[in-house]
């Protein structure tokens, strides 16, 4: 501030992430954007939430505080799906965990309020965006109020926020009180009166939703149907004491020119140099040599919050903008010739799903790709193919990878195989990661994913294309266990599919109920909010562990869970020595095997080695067992290989009889 000659900042941005001046980080985009509009902005990254003075180091801002938990919801950042503390934080210098609080946006806002009673506070970022109205919180297992009320903030700028934050800043700068800023799209505010609220749809009250989960399901689906900036209505959520939280319709999507402007701001493209001594910020490694080409997604997966945050309308950058950034990347001293990614939420979405999307918005009660591709869907990869070719032709670029995810059903829907050939020939390095998620059509329907037959068609096309171009390349499917609707029989079906593939997935995602997804609503309410029909929800931790273990049934550590799961599913036909079996039966005496918790293994029962409960037993008995065991071993050695083969046969026969 002294170097710039600033006595007071217009805004102070409080972030739960370390400061990284790169367009993959929300705080970098918002602060750079405000700067280009003439506002003075300072950043306090990861303040000490136990010390209220930590947010005073830049003084009181003239217009307000901007608060974000960071690029991730702080609870997802801190905890695994089993609610265990994660060991590292990629958004903190050195990957150190614990530099931000749980529910960071609420904690930071309350910290500010302790010091600055009347200074405006505007919440932003994904944590505030997905908790803008009443929401189910998995970590406390409760229905929580709007984050606006718990935080004491004045406004929420939800979604990506470029349009709304500039309008908010200009309104405050013109002297409008923050309590009177009720007219900006993409914002949420609170009020004691609805006299000035027009054209609003009244949602179920918070207290009613706490008493009746079906009321929450209805409220959630109403919110889901109003995420479109063209057709979305103003929503009102009532609370006690005549208090209302009002959500204005979403902000309009950015045009191509606006996207170019945002990503063309003068970012330093790395973390603050003060972090160098700690080893830097790990998250930069994933994005430093990557290009963000689009935003939004019309895929509509039930477990994804993108509809609530970025929306279903595609927003893309021009080729010129992307090529300029790529050339800038090649000048980095540690650039090795590889562009790691060119994409966004879905790499191969580079245009609106249909003609009407940019003028009338997306359809309220139907999806573009689910359950079948819409007749109006425009499937065209030509622009993306051209972009990839242009990037490959840049000097110093050896290879361009695509890591964002390819929407395989969109590839299958394309009548031309040009993109698939381009992908396999130039942009895959041995393995292509795709996300079928499951194979059970019952589960896939609830996930909002295409039928398994569509994925199998893609597999055939992919393999055929690789044969054509003489490449040995594989598919690595992302799979999810314990999604609402997944019964044990569905988990077994998935395990059988993995068996047929002949490999064991290293990474398995257990369903994680994060805020503001259809799947999370199912998890909490037990119904599909789109149909209000009951949905089976695997909530018991042990059942979830069994479903997860089935996907990795080859891992010896999972034997007991897999055996239990197969018994529960009445699929003991999958225990044996035949090729179709997932696991073998317990090995017989003298052979090593795993221990069932709380039970003795076969070794303990017959080895003669005294356990804790064997103490005080007759020493002669113990000696006799050792002698018998020794005789058996000698006998086995003397009988030779024929006896061994005969014994294996008898074991198989015993199993078949059972």
Predicted regions and their residues:
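Conserved, mostly hydrophobic/aromatic
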Residues: 154, 262, 297, 322, ...
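C-terminal accessory regions of radical SAM enzymes
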Residues: 172, 180-255, 489, 504-505, ...
